[in-house]
UniProtKB/Swiss-Prot annotation:
Pathway: Glycan biosynthesis; glycogen biosynthesis. Signal peptide: none annotated. Disulfide bonds: none annotated. PROSITE patterns: ADP_GLC_PYROPHOSPH_1, ADP_GLC_PYROPHOSPH_2. This is Glucose-1-phosphate adenylyltransferase. GO terms for biological process: glycogen biosynthetic process.
Length: 414
């Protein structure tokens, strides 16, 4: 392996995101807004850029128009240096079908990898919120002699059926003894029986070994063509799979609170909870770390504005993230995230909620513990999140935890 190996990054952005419906009704999961001004895709791409990896392809599939547009608009690099972030839709190069799984997605674009001729391929998911220096993972991958390395993070054993579960070789702590994808039952870690080492869905692979594994998987009958379900176990069975402990990853500017923060936001509850992590005085995930920034398009929006300071009508926001272009005009916002161009009118109230771009909350309307998609309008005196039965009767989604989700463009008039 060369001292400075050539790296190609691949972002797997083809998932439907059905568990995030209705937020994914009109957009791909990686295009879902997050944290006020970002989209989920901005987090893995920012991590790759901050790691120094400037050649990236993003494999897209379902409802990818807004995702493709965002990547093409925001993630433009100078071609003079050979740098790029390139969205690649499903090519159907090997048959008239969509990607059959994450491994098949890479196999169907193997011509792109062959054109670049990298020594190592870094493969990451597109729908997690975290900071990570992939150079540190690549360095350990090279030093360990593994052909394929999986990033791991501790998670509660009760969630083992949601993750790939890694068993580490006790004699070689950087190598994987076995890998099970979403097992119904498993054993905990030796030092913590209530935890597992879960796959983060991030991989580093030697190119030749990856090609060989993908070629075998494509021909196999007993396969789901999945990186976690098929490719990782293949390398583990051959004693060629390494494991990288995410907890050892050091990020400039990280705080003790948000060190090794990682969240899967694949469900509405996880998506909501990850937003709530952003807005405390000492946030669990600090969006304001300028030493490892999360990049996106800033836009030409004016600053947020707060107006009306009367005794009975005070425009204010507390414990909240308020994006550019927002006007809080005599309303109250608490413990919430407001995306650009939101309007909060007099005597209205927004509490414990996430409002996407262009939402309008008119006078005396109330929003509690809700996610409002783009361009939702609450008319005067209307409510969301106050009466669960009423919300369900209007066709809104209400999670078991009581989070109400209103689809894009809805006018709430009662």
């Amino acid at each position: 392996m060369a001292k400075n190996p050539k790296i190609l990054s691949i972002v797997l952005a083809g998932g439907e995101g059905t568990r995030l419906m209705p937020l994914t009704r009109d957009r791909a999961k990686p295009a879902v807004p997050f944290g006020g001004v970002f989209r989920l895709i901005d987090f893995p791409l920012s991590n790759l850029v901050n790691s120094g990896y400037m050649q990236t392809v993003v494999l897209t599939q379902y409802k990818s128009h807004s995702l493709d547009r965002h990547i093409s608009t925001v993630w433009r690099f100078s071609p003079l240096l050979g740098n790029y972030v390139s969205p690649v839709p499903a090519q159907q190069r090997l048959g008239k079908h969509w990607y059959l799984g994450s491994a098949d997605a890479i196999y169907q674009t193997i011509n792109i990898i062959e054109d670049v001729q990298p020594d190592i391929v870094v493969i990451v998911g597109a729908d997690h919120v975290y900071r990570m220096d992939f150079q540190q993972m690549v360095q350990q991958h090279i030093e360990s002699g593994a052909e394929f390395t999986v990033a791991g993070i501790r998670q509660p054993i009760s969630q083992s059926n949601q993750f790939g579960v890694i068993e580490v070789d006790p004699d070689h702590p950087n190598m994987i003894k076995s890998f099970q994808e979403k097992p119904q039952t498993t054993t905990g870690l030796p030092d913590d029986p209530n935890s597992i080492l879960a796959s983060m869905g991030n991989y580093v692979a030697n190119t030749d070994a990856l090609f060989a594994a993908l070629s075998l998987d494509e021909k196999a009958e007993d396969t789901k063509h999945d990186m976690g379900g098929d490719i990782a176990p293949y390398f583990a069975a051959r004693n060629e799979a390494g494991v990288y402990d995410f907890n050892s990853n050091e990020i400039p500017g990280a705080t003790p609170t948000d060190h090794a923060y990682w969240r899967d936001v694949g469900t509405l509850k996880q998506f909501y909870d990850a937003h709530m992590d952003l807005i405390s005085y000492v946030p669990e995930f600090n969006l304001y770390n300028t030493e490892w920034p999360i990049y996106t398009l800033s836009g030409n929006l004016p600053p947020a504005k707060f107006v009306h300071a009367g005794r009975d009508r005070l425009g204010h926001a507390t414990d909240s993230i308020v994006s550019p272009g927002v006007i809080v005009s005599g309303g109250e916002v608490h413990h919430s995230v407001l995306s650009p161009n939101v309007r909060i009118h007099s005597w209205s109230q927004v509490v414990d909620s996430i409002l996407f771009d262009g939402v309008v909350v008119n006078r005396r309307a109330r929003v509690y513990k809700a996610i409002l998609d783009k361009n939702v309008v609450l008319t005067e005196n209307s409510t969301v999140g106050i009466d669960t039965e009423h919300d369900l009767a209007r066709g809104f989604t209400v999670t078991p935890e009581g989070i109400t989700v209103v689809p894009k463009g809805t006018v709430v008039d009662d």
